[in-house]
């Protein structure tokens, strides 16, 4: 079976760092998509304080990732990375389901 989502070492390290710095207990991180951007959908990453009833839970490299069922089919097989450059740092996604993305790389369509 295909992994729902995988993390690079850099992404796992950054998620662990963010959770350690957070002032309140954290169940994991939530990864999803929402409407937005010029291509139609954007990714989001946020703290997850608890697991919702139907969340898919993936544990990889010491990180707990929660994905709601509406997002699952759109990100199946994706890889989450963390990239730092001189001017910005961000989580990025390589998604085999993407059909198109915008020129700036902020949004995509499936």
From Swiss-Prot:
SUPFAM superfamilies: HesB-like domain (SSF89360). GO terms for biological process: iron-sulfur cluster assembly. GO terms for molecular function: 2 iron, 2 sulfur cluster binding. It comes from the Bacteria. One of its GO terms (cellular component) is cytoplasm. NCBIfam families: iron-sulfur cluster assembly accessory protein (TIGR00049). Belongs to the HesB/IscA family. This is Uncharacterized protein RP484.
């Amino acid at each position: 079976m295909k992994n729902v989502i995988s993390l690079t070492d850099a992404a796992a390290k950054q998620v662990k760092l963010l959770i350690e710095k957070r002032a309140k207990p954290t169940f994991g991180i939530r990864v999803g998509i929402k409407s937005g951007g010029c291509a139609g959908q954007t990714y989001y990453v946020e703290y997850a304080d608890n697991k919702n009833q139907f969340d898919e839970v993936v544990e990889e490299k010491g990180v707990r990732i929660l994905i709601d069922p509406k997002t699952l089919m759109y990100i199946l097989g994706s890889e989450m990375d963390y990239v730092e450059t001189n001017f910005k740092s961000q989580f990025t996604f390589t998604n085999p389901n993407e059909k198109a993305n915008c020129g700036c790389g902020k949004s995509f369509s499936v």
